[in-house]
Amino acid sequence: MKIDIFDTTLRDGFQQEGISPSVKDKLAIAKLIDELGVDFIEGGWPGASPKEKEFFDTAKKDLNLNNAKLVSFGSTRKLNTKVEEDPQVQALIDSQTEYVCIVGKSSNLHITKALETDVDNAISMAVDTVRFLKENNRKVFFDAEHFFDGLKENAEVTLKILDSVVNEGVECFIFCDTNGGTLPHEVTELLNPIIEKYPDQEFGVHFQNDNGCAVTNSLAAVNLGVKHVQGTMNGYGERTGNADLCTLLPNLSLKMNLETVPEKSLEKLTPIANHIAELVNIAIDSRHPYVGSSAFTHKAGLHASGMSKDNTLYEHINASQVGNYTRTTVSELAGRASVITKAKEFNIEFSNDEAKNLIEQVQNLEYEGFQYEAADASLYLLMKKIKGEEPEFFSFESFRVYSERRNSQNVVSEAVCKITVEENRFVTTGEGVGPVDALNKALKSALKNNYPDVDKIKLTDYKVRIIDSSDGTEAKTRVLVEFTDGEMIWSTIGVHENLSLIHI
């Protein structure tokens, strides 16, 4: 059975606090979502703001989607306004998308208190808008706002609205759990008789995640025969978010064996999810199902030992099916099997003696405050050192960094680095908003002649922890930093009493 995937990241997902993408970012994210192979991408509300209008105006010219249909979003006509005179309805026409999605009230409480009108007017608003859009050759999706709450409050009113809209011939009628409070068993109880009554009508679902059940509710609806599912990448959305497509897609495809996106496209899920996270500047939770960095990570012990024999012993799917990868962390508790498995991840062949050597070094370093579980790049270099293969890209001679306050206002840091790269000595300076920024600029300045790609590297995460606060200002500090060059992500760790030395 084919399930239509309707992505609403660009509209409902971006109602999340802290997300305010530019038009350029929205266009880039639309291309990424299209690459995933979804059926529909809801671009936004063209009548809502100049930025939304600019997005659709630009999309007409420059957004070439290979898989998805772009959908514009709006609402039913305003109360006491003719549909042909409603500017936000006209904006839907002007967006020139083949598909439009309109939202309308389906709860008696919202009709009487939010709209301050009666059911007949609410039905007229919905019917007029659907009819007008269809007369203008648009294919219409209808988001029935507060549908589940409406059924619980006054089912007669909600079902009357449903019947009126369905009779207008909408492409899909979407049951919306706008407040996100519906439970899975309620989905079955409330929707089953409706789906049976309208066997020829396509239905969809849109669940908010306020009670943590958005994905589960979506799966329950699909089990009833719903063939249209809405959600957002990484679960973005207002309050606690929407049904998360990064969890929903693998569950539908790999667990329920339903047709959603192409298999090869699903294998891009993790990198696409991470790329979108970078564009909106909100890191994915490491423990996020399927796409998190820890989703297929195994710590030393029985799990890691079992994984060295057969991945299926401790993984419910092959990580590569969603573009992720299996990872084994190494800590002071690691055994030789775990170390050898981890080395293979780096394409390094370790003997038992070398594994024993690494374990001893990790134990000693962790006693000093290091922690290698989240610092694969540092662990890789340690393994290379044990193999006698540690690369030397440059040799460090010295550095100096200081900060000063200028004009009684700004504090500026300056750094001087002296390094040798392939027998060429460089003395470079850098000025930044702090010591770390200044050192970073000075070091990049010295390296970019031989390694021009260093300009692509940027800091994406930075964690500082004092190891033993009883030592006061002389305490050792652990710094874990994460970098990316736009394609790969890696982490390194440093421990010292001097913060500047750690950063170098």
Please name every model-derived segment:
Residues 88, 212-224:
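Catalytic cores of alpha/beta
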Residues 2-3, 7-9, 256-423, 429, ...:
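A mid-to-C-terminal "edge-of-domain" accessory segment
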Residues 21-36, 82-113, 118-140, 147-198:
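Alpha/beta enzyme core
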Residues 23-27, 41-94:
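Glycine-rich, positively charged N-terminal anion/phosphate-binding segment
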Residues 5-8, 41-43, 68-74, 100-102, ...:
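Hydrophobic faces of well-ordered beta-strands that scaffold small-molecule active sites
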Residues 52-75, 124-136, 190-205:
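Alpha-helix-loop-beta-strand connector modules within alpha/beta enzyme cores
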Residues 13, 33, 100, 142, ...:
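Conserved, mostly hydrophobic/aromatic
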Residues 502-504:
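Conserved small/polar residues in nucleotide/adenosyl-binding loops
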